[in-house]
Swiss-Prot record:
InterPro entries the UniProt entry points to: Vif
Residues that, per the record, bind Zn(2+): 108, 114, 133, 139
Protein name: Virion infectivity factor
Region (Multimerization): 151-164
Region (Interaction with host APOBEC3F): 14-17, 74-79
In-chain residues carrying the UniProt-annotated modification Phosphoserine: 144, 165
Species lineage: Viruses, Riboviria, Pararnavirae, Artverviricota, Revtraviricetes
Length: 192
């Protein structure tokens, strides 16, 4: 019988970032209690030899599964040492892969306190509102002018340690374009 291949999107991530993300997840599961209901599966509990860990995040009757891998083929850079992350949304027998932005938005719908658009109406009507969002990674759009004005009144409280963001876990910090700060150069080289 022929081998059957299944292709998955795996985000290449360096091992220190995966390690930091795992410790943030464990902290908020076991110490702060903000990730109540999440399930962490260790590498020795998985039958697959390349799976380093799995985090199962319940989202109503569905769940988000963030799987970290080790021992993968290395990328084109030296620091891509065979570590990776896949993000999957599962409901009963159906599963699909999602990108880090959508994963953060899904997490934000079910977990962590937020100062949402509905708070604008409550504030105008004179009700007390809590203008803080604990999970900023779940917002990927600019809010309305009223929303921005109300959030400008009270600065968001920084949580220590930060909440685990899937987007932050998978972001490519190695291949970002370099920014030059105030580089003047010689007058002959830049045309002056």
């Amino acid at each position: 019988m022929e081998n059957r291949w299944q292709v998955m999107i795996v985000w290449q991530v360096d091992r220190m970032r995966i390690r930091a993300w795992k410790s943030l997840v464990k902290h908020h599961m076991y110490i702060s209690g903000k990730a109540r209901g999440w399930f962490y599966r260790h590498h020795y509990e998985s039958p697959h030899p390349r799976i380093s860990s799995e985090v199962h995040i319940p989202l109503g009757d569905a769940k988000l599964v963030i799987t970290t891998y080790w021992g993968l083929h290395t990328g084109e850079r030296d620091w891509h040492l065979g570590q990776g992350v896949s993000i999957e949304w599962r409901k009963k027998r159906y599963s699909t892969q999602v990108d880090p932005d959508l994963a953060d938005q899904l997490i934000h719908l079910y977990y962590f306190d937020c100062f949402s658009e509905s708070a604008i109406r409550k504030a105008i009507l004179g009700y007390r509102v809590s203008p803080r969002c604990e999970y900023q990674a779940g917002h990927n759009k600019v809010g309305s002018l009223q929303y921005l004005a109300l959030t400008a009144l009270i600065t968001p409280k920084k949580t220590k340690p930060p909440l685990p963001s899937v987007k932050k876990l998978t972001e490519d910090r190695w291949n970002k374009p370099q920014k030059t700060k105030g580089h003047r150069g010689s007058r002959t080289m830049n045309g002056h």
